[in-house]
Curated annotation (Swiss-Prot):
It comes from the Archaea. InterPro entries: DUF2098, UCP037053. Pfam families: DUF2098 (PF09871). It comes from Methanocaldococcus jannaschii (strain ATCC 43067 / DSM 2661 / JAL-1 / JCM 10045 / NBRC 100440). This is Uncharacterized protein MJ0157.
Amino acid sequence: MGYMDEVNIKVGDYVVYINTGTKGRVVDIRKDENGDIWVVLDNNLMYRPHLLRVIDKSKITERKEDIDEVVKKLEKEELEEGKLIDLDLGDACGAG
């Protein structure tokens, strides 16, 4: 039995890291010199498979859309409350 059979995750799966909620696509599964299995995501970070959960791909895009909506809402509220000022600096340039 190969180490890929020991992991219920495969290359191409979309997963979430349960400790932080980081989501990504599995690009590789590796075994290190100590025999530990690592799952490599498209963010080039390696995770232990028991800390990952396979999710539906649509959860990735839903999360991004949620974040975009929250950012827009916060910007709008801050503009209305005067905390955020919309400035046009014209053709200002840097150091001279």
